[in-house]
A protein has these predicted regions:
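N-terminal auxiliary segments of SAM/dcSAM-dependent transferases
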Residues: 5, 9-95
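Class I SAM-dependent transferase core
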Residues: 92-119
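S-adenosyl-L-methionine-dependent methyltransferase catalytic module, highlighting the catalytic core
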Residues: 180, 215-226, 233-296
């Protein structure tokens, strides 16, 4: 019987052999952790997409379209040195209020969580530490859940009496998260995180790849700190030099991200830094190779 991963790789090889060769060179299909997590997650995604009258081929096509779009964005970034958009209003008009474009973008990102090594390294980092951070009877909040991979992993490692809440401003993103998480006890909130009262507190907050989508990431980080209980922990990630159609705030390196976290009042407890290409630090900085930064922080 063909596994979902085998099917996905076979489909990509048939439709984009060059990209398939790149994946085969960077992904270890003998890694039991990778295979088990990917198979489990893609099974949930497949169930969701089939209930919409589609097949997993649709999601893979979205992923390949996303990859092609990112090549164009990268070329423009290297030419201009900046992201294509610098305002939320502009991105909202072009992407978030354009259902067709936002749909393919979100579904493509589902597959990138496992097919891009820098993304999976970040997830593995989260998985290795989240179990130790979840307190019995605690409250977990995820901001910008999207594909729901992280809140699903947190639930898998938590005790039964941890409550889970997911907040997102996008109805499309919320629909995707709800579909993938069907049958699980989560409080879904379609609202802006800034609408949360400062008195509402959480023991753990996850905010993966959100601050690059706003014009003022410092204000968002301060809001996250405000919502944490004393001694609470947050997991926050963001990329540097990673041009995509909906990224607004450009970080040039990991140090800029660290400094902003500290400015927001956080203490960095643990971190991971992963480049998108297997090159030296010198070359990565020279050619502005995309970097993924993630950290567990405390107030």
């Amino acid at each position: 019987m063909t596994s979902l991963l085998q099917y996905i790789f076979s489909y990509i090889e048939k439709n984009n052999p060059e990209h398939a060769a790149r994946l085969n060179a960077s992904i270890d299909l003998n890694d039991s952790f990778f295979v088990s997590k990917a198979e489990s997650f893609f099974t949930r995604y497949k169930s969701f997409i089939e209930k919409k009258g589609l097949t997993i081929d649709y999601g893979i096509d979205c992923y390949l379209k996303l990859c092609a779009q990112m090549v164009f964005e990268r070329l423009e970034f290297m030419r201009s040195g900046k992201y294509a958009s610098n305002s939320f209003a502009e991105v909202e008009k072009q992407i978030y209020l354009n259902p067709e474009m936002f749909e393919y973008h979100m579904h493509g990102l589902v597959f990138s969580q496992f097919l891009w090594p820098e993304q999976f390294t970040r997830f593995k980092f989260f998985s290795n530490h989240i179990g130790k951070e979840l307190k019995s009877g605690g409250k977990y909040l995820e901001i910008g859940g999207g594909h729901a991979l992280y809140i699903l992993e947190a639930m898998n490692q938590s005790t039964e009496n941890v409550s889970f809440q997911l907040v997102d401003i996008s109805p499309s993103s919320m629909e995707l998260a709800k579909g993938i998480m069907e049958g699980l006890k989560i409080d879904f909130q379609l609202k802006n995180i800034f609408d949360f009262a400062s008195e509402e507190k959480f023991d753990f907050i996850t905010m993966g790849e959100v601050i690059e989508h706003v014009e003022d990431p410092l204000a968002l980080l301060i809001k996250v700190r405000e919502l944490l209980t004393p001694g609470g922990t947050a997991y926050i990630s963001t990329p540097a030099n990673a041009p995509t159609i909906d990224h607004i705030y450009l970080f040039n390196n990991a140090d800029e991200i660290r400094k902003l976290f500290i400015k927001a009042g956080f203490k960095i407890v643990n971190e991971t830094v992963q480049y998108a290409e297997n090159v030296s630090e010198e070359k990565a900085l020279k050619y502005k190779v995309a970097l993924m930064y993630a950290a567990f922080v405390k107030t």
